[in-house]
């Protein structure tokens, strides 16, 4: 079914305005990344095209695009709002990235900002599952040849794929136990400490949570609402030339499906003849008022 672009844009405009205001309050600056860039093996997603025998990527994953353009000068606090392409499929996202020398602080800050955004949008029934790639890598160290099969099983949460592997029953049981480990605590210090520092009962340890993007280093997380059939966002930590980074992206179209728009009634309605009414409206705007011109 063809989307009503104008109606959906009105909803996204309201959502994005709220998100921008929160991120500005947290001291983040918006980054404007070029839509078309020379193809680079480090870029993820995007639409790959050729032009005059040169290869380009259109709207690639912003985290990988920032990594390609990384320069010194910490801390770096940036956010972006744009459509991300994966082939010809596109999704509108709002994302943030925080790079600094403190690998604990950046995760705690990022997750607190996530809370601020979702509460501002009155999406208070969210929950966040936090997992660890490093735990899985250590667990499968002695069966590396099945790494791709195991991570496919994790992404699909399909135990039968693990069941079919020619590995010992003890190892299968260890993998199943990790895959099903979910709760307020998990017994792994890095995750338990992070949940304690964020101090919000909507955050859970979930070792079955994995993210396919290759730049994630260890901690990853997914954001859910019971009103949405898919995650409304996701993120994780990574390293960039020795610097610790953490960020997340929100799926604006998924959020639009569950966001309840409240009618704005704080506009000053201005009418009258064109010359006088628009002069008055301009003065009101300069004084910080919001105006709506009567037609």
Which sequence ranges carry the predicted segments?
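Positively charged, Gly/Ser-enriched RNA/tRNA-binding surfaces
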Residues: 8-29, 37-38, 61-72, 77-124, ...
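Polyanion/phosphate-binding surface patch
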Residues: 31-57, 78-80
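Acidic, His- and aromatic-enriched active-site or binding-groove loops in soluble protein domains
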Residues: 48-55, 143-165, 225
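Acidic carboxylate-rich catalytic motifs and surrounding loops in phosphoryl-/glycosyl-chemistry enzymes
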Residues: 33-36, 129-132, 295
